[in-house]
Amino acid sequence: MNRIYLDQASTSFPKAPGVAQAMMDYLTMNGVNVNRGCYSSAYSAEEVIYETRQLLAELFHFSKCKNVIFTPNVTTSLNFILKGFLKPGDHILVSAMEHNAVMRPVVQLASLGISFDRIPCRTDGSMILEKVEELIRPETKAIVTLHASNVCGT
C-alpha cells in the first residue's frame, strides 16, 4: 500500500534520501555529544558540527561560520531572534498566516512597545507582496514570514 502524507509543511518527514542513514551511522558509530570530551569520538563530533556550520554559512552567504547557531527547534530560534534583537520603538512585519510560535511572542512584544503589522494574504494563503513595501517604516527591523503553511498547504 502506498502511503500519502499530507502534513509535509509542519514536519521534516519524509527525510531526504541518505538523511536517515547518515543519522543512523552517526548514532551507531559515534553518538557522543559535542564539546564534552577530549577523545577521538568527541573530536569527530566537533568536526561534523564545524563542517555543517561551514556548509550553512556558504549556503546563506555568511562571512563567518561562527554566525551559524543551532537550536533545538524553530520556536526557540524565533524567540531568540524576536526577543533578543528587537527593542521598544522597533517595528516588524509578519504575514497574516503566521504560526502561533511567531504570533504569541509578537503579541507579547507589542505590550513592551514593539509594534507590528500583518502582511495581508490572498484566500489561497499567498502573501500580497505588493503590500510589503507599503508597510515598511523607518523603524521596521524585521520581516517574518513562513515558508510553507501546514494550515492551508501554501
Mark where each language-model region is:
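Pyridoxal 5′-phosphate
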Residues: 1-154
